[in-house]
Amino acid sequence: TFNNITQGVMKENIRQLRTASHELEAARDKWKRYRRKEIVGMRRLDYLQAVEKNTWFHLGSNNLTQIFYCLKRMLEPSLEHVDNNFNPLPKVDIIEFTPICEEVDAMLVRTRKMVDSGDFTGADEVLVEGNSLKKRLSEIRHSQQDHLQHEEENIRATLLYLNMLQETQEFISMIRHLVRASKRFQE
């Protein structure tokens, strides 16, 4: 979904953004059903074990919910921007953002493999990588904020790009927290 949102904005593809919207809603509904089943399953654990697992389960659950909201906050302005045929993102911004999107996608793939398999041996590397990505995004975001103060022609596109940078940074934070909570839950 993250990939569909970012690619949809960069390529001005409304269909890709609408697909991301449907995927996001389906994933959120699936997560709600899964969470209910997990809560019922937690009742069958030993009391002391359930207390510890319950904390990490709810932290992970809250992180996943925040990931959904983060993607939605990224999607809605992007969908509006592309649907209304506003000026596209400048090529410079697309060139700057593309490698970050690729790194985030790679991080998502590794995180998903870890969570699905329950093997968190590479968790520390993902956390370090996420931290360095957040720092890079912060630097780009600050330069965009400075750029916004001096630019007057393409403010909507710059604000959209700034929103995408901020939400990507928040998205990475939530992924890092999810990895940590999942690792502790599996222990």
Question: Predicted segments — roles?
Answer:
Residues 1-187:
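Cytosolic, long alpha-helical scaffolding segments
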